[in-house]
Amino acid sequence: MNDLSFYFSAYILCYIWVISYYSITRSASDKAHLRLAAAKAVLRLTRQWDHKVPVDVFYLTLRISQDDFPQMRKLFLSKVHQYIKERALDAKYACAFLIGIDDYHTPQYEEFQHNLIEVSQICQQVKMRQLSVQADVNLLTAYPEYIIPYLVHVLAHDPSCPNIDKYEDVKAFAPIYWPLHLLLSTLLGEEGLQYSVPGMKKESFMTTLSIFRSIKCSKDAVDANKTKTLHAICDLGILIAKRLCPDQINVSENQTVPLPAQLYATVQNDQNENPV
């Protein structure tokens, strides 16, 4: 597929998205099927053109996991799981398993946790294979922890994200807390992978905190007004990580890591917030 073909396909997809949300001549079920068709088409396009998929289309695709029709959610998440397992889809799409979680007792919690463990295992396999071939190359994007910057940004831009300046009730932040907790517990908790390889827990903890610190030293490249929300989510993530790894709290985490340029822009040091 050349660039012209990609943009033609993207135009058709945008048209489908629009009519699936705003058409008044179609039933709700028809619109849901159109949204699913568009999302599945995006997943197929990303196999070769992931770097060309706009951020807003990426988010629209992920939010099929929040669709009002349970069957659409199930079909979409099944396809995401399949493509990631086949290594035909970037692990960042695992965010789709997370943004629909708003409580520990959500029926799909254990299923999504299992899916995330599989995604983490796939990332670890890719990382180890690449390290054995090119040990001097920065392979952070192959780390399962690299899902974090995408999840933080997705949560900050999700309609369910509360305004951090207006809400004082901790329950309002459940849509933020539980997705973060599920991902971090998969990476750092007892049900995760850190005990399978010596030193993995420490490495994962350091990488996790380095990612959060790097985000706190950045601004939102899509909407600068969301920067404060990004930083607040990172503060929450750091607290969760430290609670999951109390024996690692004193580990140094000064490493700066590169972040997805589509989502984050660097800021001057004097603009950085104080670390947690």
Region annotations inferred by a language model:
Residues 1-87:
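Alpha-solenoid helical repeat scaffolds
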Residues 1-27, 110-276:
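Long internal repeat-built scaffold domains in very large eukaryotic proteins
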Residues 37-44, 59, 78-82, 95, ...:
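Residue-level signature of alpha-solenoid helical repeat scaffolds
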Residues 38-41, 65, 100-101, 112, ...:
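Small-side-chain structural scaffolding
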Residues 72, 96-106, 137, 141-145:
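Short, highly charged low-complexity linear segments
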Residues 82-92, 98-124:
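C-terminal, active-site-flanking charged/polar segments
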Residues 93-98, 129-133:
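Juxtamembrane/interface motifs at transmembrane-helix termini
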